[in-house]
Amino acid sequence: MQAQGTPLPVAGANELESIQNQPHIVYLREVGPHYGEVTVAAIDGSSPKSLPTPLKCDRIYYAASSGICLLYDTSTAAQNPLTHIPVWVTLFGSDFQPRHQFTIDGSPSRARLSPDGKYAAFTIFVTGHSYNDVNMSTATILLDTNTGASLGNLEEFETWKDGKLFQAPDFNFWGVTFAQDSNRFYATLRNGETIYLVQGDVAARKLTVLHEGVECPSLSPDGTRIAFKKRMGDRWQLTVLDLATMKEIPLAEKEDVDDQVEWLDNARILYQRANDDSQNWMSVFVVPADGSGEPNIFLQNAASPAVIREQDIHRLSPSLN
């Protein structure tokens, strides 16, 4: 079943526009009949309630009036459970109606958009279902959101390390995060048992190794730090990397977190992990980005948050400045 796009009624459309004119968050519901429902809510709580949209997804991201939705095609799985399950990749607009759609075999994992909404990136597992799996294989693909056209798999880009071309048959890439200029991005590369942070250039189709041990990077709004998950024995520790000094700061979250985090602002990050109860539903937590404080629930029974900040709204609407 592909991501559905039934237009909102007029009242709902007006409420959506009202929320979109202020800082807000787009996320997935995690419980009950509304599981996977893409939902929008004002960050400051001034909106009387969260607003559901017509889309259902397994992973989403949203920026600059554009979004990407990854969704298992469960109808195909029911018909033939022995085949690969197609994933619907949907690019949608500010009305949460699909603009471009296609399918790809795999398991949905990560999704991101550039700050200006020009490019989208997504990662699927081609084999395996976890980054713990040493035999897993990924595909990470860049898209032009205007046309829906593929800009290539990161495995097709040239990779450089220590000033030399770096090549190996077992490269796996995942977890793209874009800089403000949209051309520059960061991602994870695994070669053998070694994990690297790479910096990418969309136009040059080039990747450069920067640092070791960085999985699922997420660039801060000011472009100075990367939040990521760091392998610590049998778990992942949320950590922040200062790009100027390459100093790493472990965050106060002590639970195992397998997520590509989202920055709420330059001081706090959001991420999904299992609730501290027996139900094991996901919730979105918030924790300071400087290693202080403690984690707290930001959105109960929710996942895959995408934050639209004040400066993002002004970028889209210069008349508001």
Task: Please provide the spans of the model-predicted regions.
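Sequence signature of WD/YWTD-type beta-propeller architectures
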Residues: 1-321
